[in-house]
Amino acid sequence: MPLLDSFKVDHTIMPAPAVRRAKGMKTPSGDDITVFDLRFVAPNKEILSSEGIHTLEHLFAGFMRDHLNSKDVEIIDISPMGCRTGFYMSLIGSPDEQRVADAWSASMQDILGVKEQKDIPELNVYQCGTYKMHSLEDAKEIASKVLERRIGVMDNDALALDESKIG
């Protein structure tokens, strides 16, 4: 089975928090689609709590749209990684990594401003598949660490996986 794009980078040297342009492609009509790796914590060193990443999923998607969507960019989806170290963001357009990092930082500030658990969007049995599995406190702690550590930009060439390491 061929390696997927997300597994062609060496996770042992991946910095966090950091933005990586994971993939670019075109729609049939010629529009750019870009996928970003938004790595919150270093792989295999830290892991985001289930409740924290779930709450981030509800908050981050809206706040990123507030800060990044424009005439040349429209976010399609922001989804948590199964490894719980970050999110993938797919969008129409091709913003540079620093623009994405700036929107991410602003979104983390917004998360710190959320007052109460009841202020989390779609936090109900009708709109969320695990509506009781949330922690605003964990989400704020994650946001605070991201801001404290400062978001960097990853270099795909520097992270290229030496496939001989995996046999």
Curated annotation (Swiss-Prot):
The keyword Iron applies. Its cofactor is Fe cation. It holds the Pfam family LuxS. Fe cation binds at residues 54, 58, 128. Involved in the synthesis of autoinducer 2 (AI-2) which is secreted by bacteria and is used to communicate both the cell density and the metabolic potential of the environment. The regulation of gene expression in response to changes in cell density is called quorum sensing. Catalyzes the transformation of S-ribosylhomocysteine (RHC) to homocysteine (HC) and 4,5-dihydroxy-2,3-pentadione (DPD). Belongs to the LuxS family. It is an enzyme of class 4 (lyase). The keyword Nucleotide-binding does not apply. Binds 1 Fe cation per subunit. Its EC number is 4.4.1.21. Keywords: Autoinducer synthesis, Iron, Lyase, Metal-binding, Quorum sensing. GO terms for molecular function: iron ion binding; S-ribosylhomocysteine lyase activity. The gene is luxS. Homodimer. NCBIfam families: PRK02260.1-2 (NF002602). This is S-ribosylhomocysteine lyase. GO terms for biological process: quorum sensing. It comes from the Bacteria. It catalyses: S-(5-deoxy-D-ribos-5-yl)-L-homocysteine = (S)-4,5-dihydroxypentane-2,3-dione + L-homocysteine.
